[in-house]
Amino acid sequence: PGLDDKVLTEWNGMMLATLAEAAALLQRPDWLAAAIKNGEFLINQLCTESGSISIRRSWHQDGNPRAQHAALGADLAQLVDGFTRLAEATGHAIWITHAKTIADKLLSDYWDAENGGVFTTPHDGEQLIVRQKDVMDNATPSANSTAAFALYRLAGLTGDERFTHHADQILQLLSHIAA
C-alpha cells in the first residue's frame, strides 16, 4: 500500500493547541518542546511570505518536500488557536505575533463582511456558484467555531478589540443556527 505522508495544516494546528495546553497544565517540558517544534515547522514549511503571508493547506515529504494547495478558513482558524495557546504556554511574544498575522489574514481574506463569519475559501480563491461557510462542527470543529474561540483568546492577549468584535459577529451568526 502507498504511504500517506501529507501534513495537513488544520490538523497540525489542532495538535499544536492540544500539546501546548497539555504541556502547560501537566508541566511537561517535553510536550512543550514538541509543540514548539510543531509551531516552527508550521511557520517554516506551510506559511510563506512574498509580500504578504501565504498559507498552504498541506505539505508532502515525497522526496521533494513541498507545500501545496491554498489554505482553507479552518486551516487559518486552527493556526490562530494553536499559536495563541503556544504563546500562553511559553510566554514568548513571537507566537502572539504569528497568531495575529494569521488572524489578520483570516479576517482580510476569508471574512464575510455582509453576514459575518468565515468563508471556507479566500476571496481570491476559485469562484464557485456558492461560497461555502462551515457553521456546524463535524469530525473536526468548524472554521467559525474555532475562529470565534481563537479570536477571543487572541484579543485577551493583545487587547485588540477588532478580534473581539469579529468573534462576537461569529457567535451572532452561529446563534441563529443554535436557536
Pin down the residues of each PLM region.
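Glycan-recognition and catalytic cores of secretory/periplasmic carbohydrate-active enzymes
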Residues: 1-179
